[in-house]
C-alpha cells in the first residue's frame, strides 16, 4: 500500500483582523500566493500531475465563496486542476490533508495540494454563516440557555442529561468558559499558558525559526509582509493577569489566554512515497494516521482528546511514542484540558508557541500547524 508523505509547505505571515498587515488581501489571492510558494519548492512536480487542490476554509462565503479552491486553481493558470473547498471550521485544512492521505492510500491519485485560508478582515464582504434568520428554531431553547449563562454560570453539564438539545450555534468563547467550568482549570493556569505561548513564540522568532517557516506575502500595493503581527515580546504573567474576562462577567477567558482574530493562508504538498522517489524529492514527513471525534458542541474544545486517541490507535502507538504535539490554541483552557486528559508532557507541547501568540486564521490553522 502506498504511503503518503509531505514534500513541501508554505505559510503566510499571520495578520491581525481589521487592523493588521493583511487587511487588503482577498482570501483567494492570499491562498494563491501560498499554493504558488509551496509548489515553487518542488519544481520537479509538474502541476498537471497534481490530482486535486483541496482547500479548507471556515467561512467559505463572500470573497471566499464560489468554491474558492477552484478559484485559486484558475487564478494560478491551472484550469486543468480540480478544486474542492472543505469546511470543518478550525480543522478545515487538517481535514484536507487527511483527504489527500486517504486518496493516496486508496490509490486514487499520487499528488495533492492541501491548503487553508481565512481572512477575517474580509468578512464584511460576506460569510457562509452570516445570513440573518438562518438558525433552526429547534435550537432556540438551547440558544436562550447560552444567553443566560453568558451572564454568569457556576457549572456546566451536558444538556443531553436533561433530554435537551445542545446549542449548535454557541459562540466559541462561551464554549471555552464551559470547558473551564467542566474541567476546573483555573484562570491562573490559563494565563500562565498564554504567557508561555507568547514567550515561546518570542524565543522562536529570535532563533529565526519563523523566518524560515514563513513565505512572504506581496500586498496589492507591492508591499512585502514577512512577519506575524501577533507575538508580543516581553509578555509577563503580571500583565496578563490584569486583563478582564471577555465572555462572562465571572469568566476566566481573556484576550491574554485566547487567540485573536486573524488573516492568513498556508499550503502543503502531499504525495505518495513512490511519486516522491520518482521525482527525487526527500519527504519532510510521513502521514501515519488521523482521527476525528465528536462531543457536545458546548465543550467543543475538548475534541482533541478522543481524536488523538483514535489516531494513536490506528497507528498502534501511544502518547509516550510521540516526541512533539501541537494542539491549537484557540483558548488556553482547551489545550490544557485536552493535554492533561491525554497525559501529554507540556514540555513536548506547542514548543514554539501557538495561536494565542501567532494567531488563528480558522481555515489556515491546520496547514499552519503542519507546516
Q: Where do the PLM segments sit?
A:
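Conserved active-site "lid/cap" helical segment
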Residues: 1-72, 76, 175-187, 204, ...
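N-terminal extracellular/periplasmic Venus flytrap/periplasmic-binding protein-like
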Residues: 11-13, 24-33, 44, 152, ...
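Beta-strand segments within the central parallel beta-sheet cores of soluble alpha/beta enzyme folds
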Residues: 47-56, 84-88, 112-116, 189-196, ...
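Conserved catalytic cysteine-centered active-site region
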Residues: 57-112, 152, 167-170, 234-260, ...
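Active-site-proximal alpha-helical scaffold in enzymes
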Residues: 73, 84, 88-118, 126, ...
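Flexible glycine-/small-residue-enriched beta->alpha junction loops
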Residues: 111-178
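Glycine- and Gly-Pro-enriched alpha-helical subdomains that act as flexible
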Residues: 273-321, 339
Amino acid at each position: 500500500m502506498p504511503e503518503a508523505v509531505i514534500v513541501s509547505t508554505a505559510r503566510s505571515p499571520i495578520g491581525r483582523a481589521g487592523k493588521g498587515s493583511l487587511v487588503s488581501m482577498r482570501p483567494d489571492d492570499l491562498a494563491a500566493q501560498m499554493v504558488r510558494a509551496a509548489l515553487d519548492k518542488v519544481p520537479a512536480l509538474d502541476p498537471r500531475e497534481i490530482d486535486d487542490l483541496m482547500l479548507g476554509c471556515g467561512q467559505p462565503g463572500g470573497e471566499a465563496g464560489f468554491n474558492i479552491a477552484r478559484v485559486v486553481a484558475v487564478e494560478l493558470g491551472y484550469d486543468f486542476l480540480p478544486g474542492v473547498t472543505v469546511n470543518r471550521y478550525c480543522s478545515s485544512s487538517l481535514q484536507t490533508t487527511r483527504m489527500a492521505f486517504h486518496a493516496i492510500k486508496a490509490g486514487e491519485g499520487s499528488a495533492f495540494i492541501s491548503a487553508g485560508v481565512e481572512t477575517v478582515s474580509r468578512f464584511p464582504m460576506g460569510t457562509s454563516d452570516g445570513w440573518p434568520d438562518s438558525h433552526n428554531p429547534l435550537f432556540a431553547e438551547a440558544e436562550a440557555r447560552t444567553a443566560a449563562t453568558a451572564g454568569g454560570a457556576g457549572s456546566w453539564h451536558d444538556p443531553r442529561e436533561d433530554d435537551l438539545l445542545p446549542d449548535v450555534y454557541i459562540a466559541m468563547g462561551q464554549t471555552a468558559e464551559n470547558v473551564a467550568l467542566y474541567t476546573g482549570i483555573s484562570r491562573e493556569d490559563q494565563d500562565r499558558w498564554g504567557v508561555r505561548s507568547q514567550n515561546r513564540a518570542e524565543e522562536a522568532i529570535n532563533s529565526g525559526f519563523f523566518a524560515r517557516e514563513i513565505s512572504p506575502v506581496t500586498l496589492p500595493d507591492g508591499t512585502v509582509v514577512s512577519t506575524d503581527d501577533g507575538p508580543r515580546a516581553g509578555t509577563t504573567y503580571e500583565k496578563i493577569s490584569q486583563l478582564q474576562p471577555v465572555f462572562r462577567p465571572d469568566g476566566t477567558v481573556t484576550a491574554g489566554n485566547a487567540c485573536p482574530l486573524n488573516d492568513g493562508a498556508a499550503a502543503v504538498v502531499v504525495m505518495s512515497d513512490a511519486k516522491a522517489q520518482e521525482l527525487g524529492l526527500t519527504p519532510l514527513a510521513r502521514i501515519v494516521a488521523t482521527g476525528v471525534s465528536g462531543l457536545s458542541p458546548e465543550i467543543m474544545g475538548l475534541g482533541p482528546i478522543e481524536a488523538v486517541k483514535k489516531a494513536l490507535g490506528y497507528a498502534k502507538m501511544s502518547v509516550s511514542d510521540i516526541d512533539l504535539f501541537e494542539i491549537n490554541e484557540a483558548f488556553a483552557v482547551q489545550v490544557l484540558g485536552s493535554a492533561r486528559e491525554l497525559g501529554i508532557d507540556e514540555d513536548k507541547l506547542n514548543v514554539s508557541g501557538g495561536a494565542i501568540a501567532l494567531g488563528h486564521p480558522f481555515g489556515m490553522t491546520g496547514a499552519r500547524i503542519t507546516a
